[in-house]
């Protein structure tokens, strides 16, 4: 094996909705594909097609008509390990075209990831893929590093789950982490429901993809919902049209801000939960009184569901209303926040000081899977 210094570590951020993977030192992930595994509904539908027993990512998406699609990651946590192995195999061999036994691998995990899951990740990497070294890092810590900070509170909202994670000098504070099972997929579902009530039919997974695209292109956060509603009723400035693949044009107005508004008011989708602003505030209040000032001044947004226009302004407004009046509040929405976790991983894995964080194969063989709790962070 070549000298460890010459070999770029692999960075793999496994999200509920998308896998982001690439080589450490790059400024963006080389591979971004849906975290799905599809299996044929009927065996050998077409004779002589040389059908595979499973399809992963975009390939599964394209052939979804004949497949049953499964998401191996639910709410940020791996729930189906066989399918997860298929996703990793696809990531290394088909997307990145690298040999995992030649590169250290940095994996991300959800905050509050069960201990068993963390051990299992390392076991699969060492025993199935033969990785020379592995590190498992909490995704929110990586987002914070990507924004150039070591202390702050990260609101990470992806496709399947949102978390607020207070971090002090590089360490997440587990007692104050809060999880909210409300994220991008719920917003897409809500928009599908509104459109269905308006007489459009969006039911299949293919149509769900169209609605997700509509959400990503047209939705925005209203600074003041009441005000925005009045505007949308009296003028057409809020209305935008969207062309469906079949040429039909849909016009959406109030739905543009109503859909992501659910993040601040989960009761709109029947959830008895606090909105993202209140969850962030509650998370800060669980921390020691001496560090709250540092957290209020460094609220960092990360993940695809924080990409809505005006989200930082609204967040700032809502938290100012909850916090002590003299408190200085700063909400940071880095432009690259969609891939913030991956970028943080890329930065971290390229640092020479990071060498002591890796678990080498020899250490794993000696101590077994529980070593992941001693090293990594």
Curated annotation (Swiss-Prot):
* The family this protein is said to belong to: Belongs to the actin family.
Q: What is its EC number?
A: 3.6.4.-
Cysteines engaged in disulfide bonds, as pairs: none
Its taxonomic path starts at: Eukaryota, Viridiplantae, Streptophyta, Embryophyta, Tracheophyta
Q: Which InterPro entries match?
A: Actin, Actin/actin-like_CS, Actin_CS, ATPase_NBD
Q: What class of enzyme is it?
A: hydrolase
Q: Any idea which UniProt keywords this protein has?
A: ATP-binding, Cytoplasm, Cytoskeleton, Hydrolase, Nucleotide-binding
PANTHER family to which the protein is assigned, alphabetical: ACTIN
Query: Gene behind this chain?
Result: SAC1
What species is given as this protein's source?
Glycine max
According to UniProt, the name of this protein is Actin-1
């Amino acid at each position: 094996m070549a000298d460890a210094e010459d070999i770029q570590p692999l960075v793999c951020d496994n999200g509920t909705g998308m896998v982001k993977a690439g080589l450490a030192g790059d400024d963006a992930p080389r591979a971004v594909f849906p975290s799905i595994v599809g299996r044929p509904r009927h065996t050998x539908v077409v004779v002589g097609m040389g059908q595979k027993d499973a399809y992963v990512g975009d390939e599964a998406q394209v052939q979804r008509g004949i497949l049953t699609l499964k998401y191996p990651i639910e709410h940020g946590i791996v729930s189906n390990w066989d399918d997860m192995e298929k996703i990793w195999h696809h990531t290394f061999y088909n997307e990145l075209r690298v040999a995992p036994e030649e590169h250290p691998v940095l994996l991300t995990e959800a905050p509050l990831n069960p201990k068993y899951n963390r051990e299992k990740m390392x076991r699969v990497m060492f025993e199935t893929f033969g990785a020379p070294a592995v590190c498992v890092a909490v995704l929110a810590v990586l987002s914070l590093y990507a924004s150039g900070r070591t202390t702050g509170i990260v609101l990470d909202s992806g496709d399947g789950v949102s978390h607020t994670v207070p971090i002090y000098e590089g360490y997440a504070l587990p007692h104050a982490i809060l999880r909210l099972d409300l994220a991008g997929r719920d917003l897409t579902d809500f928009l599908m429901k509104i459109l269905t009530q308006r007489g459009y039919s969006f039911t299949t997974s293919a149509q769900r993809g169209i609605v997700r695209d509509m959400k990503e292109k047209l939705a925005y956060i209203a600074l003041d919902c009441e005000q925005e509603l009045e505007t949308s009723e009296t003028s057409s400035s809020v209305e935008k049209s969207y062309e469906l693949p079949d040429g039909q044009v849909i016009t959406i107005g109030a739905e543009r801000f109503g859909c992501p508004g659910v993040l601040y008011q989960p009761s709109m989708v029947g959830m008895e939960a606090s909105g993202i602003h209140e969850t962030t505030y509650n998370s800060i209040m669980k921390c020691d009184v001496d560090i709250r000032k540092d957290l209020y001044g460094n609220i960092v947004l990360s993940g695809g569901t924080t990409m809505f226009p005006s989200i930082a302004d609204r967040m700032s407004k809502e938290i100012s209303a909850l916090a002590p009046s003299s408190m200085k509040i700063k909400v940071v929405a880095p432009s690259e926040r969609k891939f913030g976790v991956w970028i943080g991983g890329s930065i971290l894995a390229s640092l020479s000081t990071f060498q002591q964080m890796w678990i080498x194969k020899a250490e794993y063989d000696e101590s077994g899977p529980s070593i992941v709790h001693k090293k990594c962070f």
